[in-house]
Amino acid sequence: MAQRAQRSLEAAKKAVPEGTFAVGIGLAVTGITTYAFFVACARGLSEKDYAAVIGGLWPLVFVVAPGCFLPLEQEIGRALAHRRSQNIGGGPVVRRAAIAALWGTGGLLLLTAIFSGVLRENLFKGVGGLVICFAIALLTYAAQHLPRGPLSGNGRFGPYGVILGAEGCIRLLPAAILWFAGVTDPVAYGLCLAIPPVLASLLSLRGQHGLVEPGPQSPWSELSTNLGYLLSGSVLAQGLSYAPILIATVLATSTQHAEVAAFVSGFFLARVPIILFQAVQAALLPKLARLAGAGEHEDFRNGLRKLVLIVIGVGVIGVVGALVLGPWAVQLFFDKAISGGELAMLAAGSGAFILALTLAQALIALMGHAKATVSWAIGIAVGAIALVALSAADVELFLRVELAFLLACLGCAAVMAVLLVRQMRAGVPAQSVERLLAGIEHEPLEI
């Protein structure tokens, strides 16, 4: 009996991927500090400026920056991990990635300059300084995602977790000071968002050596495996996740600043299940990896079904919680008023998005990159059609945004489910699950 218990304990330890706890702590810290940052902005800014910073700048940054740079980070980590397994230095890979990041950032900055007027008037409520904040954020997030790849690829998940947690803390501290000091300039709060990524990176890289070792020359193909599909899918997924507040901010009239501010606060409150979702993944996915690695494919399929059921359960809890406690929480923390029905709709959309994200990551793990990207595109098309139809029917702005978001996420999930079932019939190789773990455990969804 004692030997059996010892074997079970050793198996449990092996089942937990290296760095899970470090990254988990970083995620927890950044989650808490992010919501505290939202509270500071809600309390310190006018409703118009709050809508501009949190309803305009924040989602735009987190659609474009992670959408464009996270796939590059993932490919760096994958390539370096492969080289490390063969005792080959990855310096040339990182240099290739730096060149790609430089060109990509330059292109994004050029587009920002071209469309600066559109951004200022439609998303930033006439605050031109927020365009500068957005440009700074592109630079700092490019500078952050570039070292995150070598940290992940070299198994340095402690410093990786430090980046996640430190960014949230560095962002919150000056914002809290601005709030308590009575500063109401939205650009000041925008800089609190734009600058911290590079500071967090510098902090995490202190004392790190051997991240970029010399090695054989790296062809572009070593870095660009499925990069196009990863990039497209990442941008589409991040864009869909923030679509409700981006659309509401753009379509709202000048007399709806208070409603937009309340909607933005409710939207982020409804995203709390995403944090619970990541905790569930951290607990269950290692077990799935062990089952697949042992060739127990039927057990793997059963485990994946359980994961989907748990995701649905988390979504249901989120909807009920939003309906019952949501209005009270929004009033308490953000000093905004929003109905439980609206919050429940937003929570339902977030739950459907989580389900779609889970299925997308499983598809990618089974080398279904193109299928995942196409699924995101189809779902977004469904949402766009729904939004146009609801607008033609003169449905109230926020309700049509909520319904379109929900339908888009459900559309993505439905298409992915069909494609995933077909993909799994061909078998579940163990290396696919390793890719799934790498994609979820160490490449978290950007809040």
Question: Residues of each region from the PLM?
Answer:
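Interfacial segments at transmembrane-helix termini and the short loops linking adjacent helices
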Residues: 47-48, 116-133, 257, 323-351
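Interhelical loop/hinge segments that connect adjacent transmembrane helices in multipass membrane
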Residues: 2-14, 158-162, 182, 186-192, ...
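Helix-loop junctions and terminal segments of transmembrane helices
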Residues: 69-85, 266, 270, 274-295, ...
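Small-residue hotspots at the loop-to-helix junctions and early N-terminal turns
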Residues: 48-55, 59, 131, 257-272, ...
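Hydrophobic alpha-helical transmembrane segments
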Residues: 128-133, 161-210, 378-382, 396-423
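Transmembrane helical elements of multi-pass membrane transporters/channels
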Residues: 18-38, 166-167, 171, 189-204, ...
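Membrane-interface junctions at transmembrane-helix termini in multi-pass inner-membrane proteins
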Residues: 139-162, 342-375
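Membrane-water interface segments that mark the loop-to-transmembrane alpha-helix transition
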Residues: 14-30, 34, 56-57, 69-117, ...
